């Protein structure tokens, strides 16, 4: 009798439009579609890391229940509009940005002054409208976070936010706007009682739907791994992988076993890595910045590109991996 549980053999990602995608996985054993679909949906909506404006200081404004001469919106509406700006920070956890504009016209996210490592995903988003003689001067603090954090929690927990004129915002860090899933029928040979999981995701553009699913699955794996250690058991022992066999690779995050070609680096960067026998992402993250800079033809620009691509997947250079490479990993 077959005792092994089926696992998906195909994963298809279909782009449905701007920042929307459908991820289809099949086949699953009966019931696993709902089990995993619901878990993924909850994690995607509640636990994804993102960026949001958390504090604002506006020149001439002492509190949010104010109005500004020459600005059509009151301060409350300006703050609500500001929450709609989608930020993305590269290699940093927080930043303070400036917005200064005067004269009649529309103030958009494009008017926010940003350094090279801060990206605004929706630069045409409207923040305020200025009348003739109007002026808007504000400082915006953007932070990295997870989920939703009410402003009153931060207001009373951080002494630095108690200065007059500093307005603390409710922060919705999650880059995932909507998630739905459906379970359909799947078939493998003579079995017709299997599940196909269809997950539809809409993000704010700071992360792709595919990366969001990957990150949420990683969170679930890390949380469930705790149960594998009950009674002092070793996580690795749960998988019953034969020593030296291909199953040894299951101890590593699957993304580490992928070729560096999937990072979609520039041709120059990719060729430099291959020249150093760096074929897998697991090989790459173990190298330090200094080691990579010693690579012929790989300069600071290529290094920054590599760091940004890794950071988008929750990885960094200089990480340590025990027992790498896993036995059975194909050598190229």
Swiss-Prot record:
It is an enzyme of class 2 (transferase). Residues 252-332 are annotated as: Alpha C-terminal domain (alpha-CTD). Residues 1-231 are annotated as: Alpha N-terminal domain (alpha-NTD). Keywords: DNA-directed RNA polymerase, Nucleotidyltransferase, Transcription, Transferase. DNA-dependent RNA polymerase catalyzes the transcription of DNA into RNA using the four ribonucleoside triphosphates as substrates. The N-terminal domain is essential for RNAP assembly and basal transcription, whereas the C-terminal domain is involved in interaction with transcriptional regulators and with upstream promoter elements. This is DNA-directed RNA polymerase subunit alpha. The lineage of its organism: Bacteria, Pseudomonadati, Pseudomonadota, Betaproteobacteria, Burkholderiales.
């Amino acid at each position: 009798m077959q005792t092994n549980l089926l696992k998906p053999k195909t994963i298809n990602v279909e782009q449905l439009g701007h920042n929307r995608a459908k991820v289809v996985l099949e086949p699953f054993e009966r019931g696993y579609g709902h089990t995993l679909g619901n878990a993924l949906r909850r994690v995607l909506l509640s636990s994804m890391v993102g960026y949001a404006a958390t504090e604002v200081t506006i020149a001439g404004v002492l509190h949010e229940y104010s109005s500004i001469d020459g600005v059509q919106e009151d301060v409350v509406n300006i703050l609500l509009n500001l929450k709609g700006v989608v930020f993305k920070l590269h290699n940093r956890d927080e930043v303070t940005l400036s917005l200064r504009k005067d004269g009649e016209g529309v103030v958009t996210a494009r008017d926010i002054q940003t350094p090279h490592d801060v990206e605004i995903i929706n630069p045409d988003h409207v923040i305020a409208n200025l009348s003739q003689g109007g002026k808007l001067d504000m400082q915006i603090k953007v932070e990295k976070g997870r989920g939703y954090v009410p402003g009153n929690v931060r207001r009373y927990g951080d002494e630095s936010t108690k200065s007059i004129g500093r307005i603390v915002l409710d922060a919705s860090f999650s880059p995932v706007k909507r998630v739905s899933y459906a379970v359909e029928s799947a078939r493998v040979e003579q079995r017709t009682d299997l599940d196909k999981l269809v997950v539809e995701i809409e993000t704010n553009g700071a992360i792709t739907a595919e990366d969001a699913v990957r990150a949420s699955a990683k969170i679930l794996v890390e949380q469930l791994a705790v149960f594998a250690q009950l009674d002092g058991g070793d996580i690795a022992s749960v998988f019953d992988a034969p020593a030296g066999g291909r199953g040894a690779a299951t101890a590593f995050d699957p993304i580490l076993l992928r070729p560096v070609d999937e990072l979609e680096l520039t041709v120059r960067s990719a060729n430099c890595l291959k020249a150093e026998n760096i074929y897998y992402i697991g090989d790459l993250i173990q190298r330090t910045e200094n080691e990579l800079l010693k690579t012929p033809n790989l300069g600071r620009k290529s290094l920054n590109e590599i760091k940004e691509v890794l950071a988008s997947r929750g990885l960094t250079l200089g990480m340590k991996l025990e027992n790498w490479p896993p036995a059975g990993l194909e050598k190229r």
